[in-house]
């Protein structure tokens, strides 16, 4: 079992002061093996904070990030899954299923994690999985002014990925669970 925290679109300090205290109390060091971030941290202090939770931190650049060293997209393998990471402002139209599926094919990944819309989504599409963890701070976007803070915790175990979405609604943390299974690859003999 490998725990992967997926979050993004924090926009600190421009659109939000910090992560919600209820989220901060849940995100403790030593529990999570990987963090993947869809960008728009905006300041180095958020990067440093995430490193205290887990040193294995993968970040892609959002259009408001100060650190130009973050790549546009990134792929990594966790367990049996190949994950792709992209902020999403490059995908036109934003959040479009077919455009995201094309990016997923281009990256050759089982799970594509993208952001930019600030709205949580997770679905199977064209044989893959697309996840948007939303905005971890509830920062507004050009699409939506009223955003519930959210993040995703993935439990990857073999060919199974359980996606838990944590969303702060009316001051309470609500958790939903979605399970995805990757069919095992079979090799055919000569």
From Swiss-Prot:
Bilayer topology term: Peripheral membrane protein
Location of the protein in the cell: Cytoplasm; Endosome membrane; Prevacuolar compartment membrane; Golgi apparatus, trans-Golgi network membrane
InterPro entries referenced in this protein's UniProt entry, alphabetically: Calcineurin-like_PHP_lpxH, Metallo-depent_PP-like, Phosphodiesterase_MJ0936/Vps29, Vps29
Keywords recorded for this protein, A-Z: Auxin signaling pathway, Cytoplasm, Endosome, Golgi apparatus, Membrane, Protein transport, Transport
A single GO BP: receptor recycling
Taxonomic superkingdom: Eukaryota
Coiled-coil parts of chain: none
GO CC field: cytosol; Golgi apparatus; intracellular membrane-bounded organelle; late endosome membrane; membrane; multivesicular body; retromer complex
Organism: Arabidopsis thaliana
Protein name (record): Vacuolar protein sorting-associated protein 29
Gene3D superfamilies assigned to the protein according to its UniProt record, in alphabetical order: 3.60.21.10
């Amino acid at each position: 079992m490998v725990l992967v925290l997926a979050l993004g679109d924090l926009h600190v300090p421009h659109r939000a002061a910090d992560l919600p205290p209820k989220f901060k109390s849940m995100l403790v060091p030593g529990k999570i093996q990987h963090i993947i971030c869809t960008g728009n941290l905006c300041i180095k202090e958020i990067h440093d904070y995430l490193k205290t939770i887990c040193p294995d931190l993968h970040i892609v650049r959002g259009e408001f990030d100060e650190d130009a060293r973050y790549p546009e997209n990134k792929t990594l393998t966790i367990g049996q899954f190949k994950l792709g990471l992209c902020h999403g402002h490059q995908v036109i139209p934003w959040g479009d299923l077919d455009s995201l599926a094309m990016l997923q094919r281009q990256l050759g990944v089982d799970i594509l994690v993208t952001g930019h819309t600030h709205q949580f989504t997770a679905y199977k599409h064209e044989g893959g999985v697309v996840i948007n963890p939303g905005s971890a701070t509830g920062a507004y976007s050009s699409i939506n002014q009223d955003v519930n803070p959210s993040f995703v915790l993935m439990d990857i175990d073999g060919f199974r990925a359980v996606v838990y979405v944590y969303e702060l609604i009316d001051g309470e943390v609500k958790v939903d669970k979605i399970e995805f299974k990757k069919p095992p690859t079979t090799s055919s003999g000569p």
